[in-house]
Amino acid sequence: MVGWAGNPSFDLFKLPEEHDEMRSAIRALAEKEIAPHAAEVDEKARFPEEALVALNSSGFNAVHIPEEYGGQGADSVATCIVIEEVARVDASASLIPAVNKLGTMGLILRGSEELKKQVLPALAAEGAMASYALSEREAGSDAASMRTRAKADGDHWILNGAKCWITNGGKSTWYTVMAVTDPDRGANGISAFMVHKDDEGFTVGPKERKLGIKGSPTTELYFENCRIPGDRIIGEPGTGFKTALATLDHTRPTIGAQAVGIAQGALDAAIAYTKDRKQFGESISTFQAVQFMLADMAMKVEAARLMVYSAAARAERGEPDLGFISAASKCFASDVAMEVTTDAVQLFGGAGYTTDFPVERFMRDAKITQIYEGTNQIQRVVMSRALLR
């Protein structure tokens, strides 16, 4: 009697071969060029220049840039894979490809062809970086209450105000900036602009001192009569808030991917350590309590990865109503990352609480994934509104 051998050609929930090849390539690069510097990057809170060089030279710094602008034209799932694999060894370095997408997605979705040609090739071929400026000190979750203003002045726009929590601030060449152009129209009076680091009246504040992702600078941005050309507006005046929300629908899965990578890195470290660590004359991986913790950790990571890839695939297809799945993928994956990294530290015992091992760094880095691109409480607001409308 011949047993059933399965149907190898059944490809539902199976990534295409080119995605697997990309994963292998970026994993090899991350382990060789990025991982050896991760602990020092964290300890010294310095930008991961080695990672930037490696990602730029291999084309992984901004894989999402369309081919017509000199990029690889990688789809949303492939972009998530790149971010995930870099985050598996260094969350700070993973913010290079992640924030390059965040800082350009509004332009890709709503910008003019001329503006795209001005900005995107610099990221694709010249190693430039981009950041996203939405939040302000008094306009965080309530982003529509922002106070930064933009006023038309002939063929230019004049920006005044300040933005905060800008990831990779001071390292980026281009910034997508949201500003109020019509104060009387609320959210419909907000517009989006591309600001260059050398624009008159634009300055970057000092770096924040943070719990985690210490290698990625977080700064304020200041606009003091910042003058930019009139064609640097993204879309029509008053459409900026819609552009901001559409951007987040496409980029929240990338934060989910970062969270999955952090969790996977912690899980990998925990598995290796529990196999090696001996107590009571045997490896602690033989103890059922440890086995159950590892099983739960792996189960959560796998579920988070599938949700992130599903959200990214739906975004790539251009499906409407991405709000729920994008928020869910970011929210679930980041909660998983916090749980898994905490359990990884627990499995290491006292050793996990020291900087001799990477799990404490993974745990500190995981926390931000529950906060940026909308706190997980806001993600639940987004999801519940989608369910109840």
Curated annotation (Swiss-Prot):
Cofactor names: FAD
InterPro entries per UniProt: Acyl-CoA_DH_CS, Acyl-CoA_Oxase/DH_mid-dom, Acyl-CoA_Oxase/DH_mid-dom_sf, AcylCo_DH-like_C, AcylCo_DH/oxidase_C, AcylCoA_DH/ox_N, AcylCoA_DH/ox_N_sf, AcylCoA_DH/oxidase_NM_dom_sf
Gene Ontology CC, one term: plasma membrane
Catalytic activity: a 2,3-saturated acyl-CoA + A = a 2,3-dehydroacyl-CoA + AH2
Alphabetic keyword roster: FAD, Flavoprotein, Oxidoreductase
Family per record: Belongs to the acyl-CoA dehydrogenase family.
Protein name: Probable acyl-CoA dehydrogenase FadE25
Species this protein is from: Mycobacterium tuberculosis (strain ATCC 25618 / H37Rv)
